[in-house]
Amino acid sequence: MVSLRLQKRLAASVLKCGQKRLWLDPNESSEISMANSRASIRKLIKDGLVMKRSTVIHSRSRARAFLEAKRKGRHTGSGKRKGTRNARMPTKVLWMRRQRVLRRLLRKYRAAKKIDKHQYHEFYLGSKGNLYKNKTVLIEAIHVSKADKIKSDKLTSQQEARRAKNTASRAKRNEKAQIVAKVDV
């Protein structure tokens, strides 16, 4: 058996691959052994005595199928879990995510003049104090707050109107009483 170490090394550098990927024709080993330069190796490649093997395909089809199943919720039971709940999904990350969502909503509402700066501050502190579980709860709280504000404004305006009416009627009554007193005198 002829040693083809040199030829393998040259062929690997010419074909830009590893020596394991080379295929040297076993029937023409004597002719291959005569090649001692890159040019002669190129000629052998052209003749088909030296070839570069195709890479072995490493299929990901099974991995894709497994991932698809995991997305459906398979293979995620208690037996498959290694870390604690906090290690798998840190509560701090969940908290930060929630705060960012709520604060973004509050900023948007303040910019759109849906809430004033005082309400913004009140809701901001409330969200920081874990008062609102999610965005929906916060929006609901804002609506309730606005409804209460409208109701209280309406009540105060009604009270003001009633007060003004009472004052006017009292003044009229006093005026009448003075006129009656003058007539009597």
UniProtKB/Swiss-Prot annotation:
Q: Where is this region: Disordered?
A: 152-185
Q: Which InterPro entries match?
A: 60S_ribosomal_eL19_sf, Ribosomal_eL19, Ribosomal_eL19_dom, Ribosomal_eL19_dom1, Ribosomal_eL19_euk
* A single GO molecular function term of this UniProt record: RNA binding
GO CC annotation:
cytosolic large ribosomal subunit
GO BP field:
translation
Pfam families of this UniProt entry?
Answer: Ribosomal_L19e (PF01280), Ribosomal_L19e_C (PF25476)
Sorted keywords for this record are: Ribonucleoprotein, Ribosomal protein
**Hey, which family's this protein in?**
Belongs to the eukaryotic ribosomal protein eL19 family.
Can you name this protein? Large ribosomal subunit protein eL19
Biological source species: Tetrahymena thermophila (strain SB210)
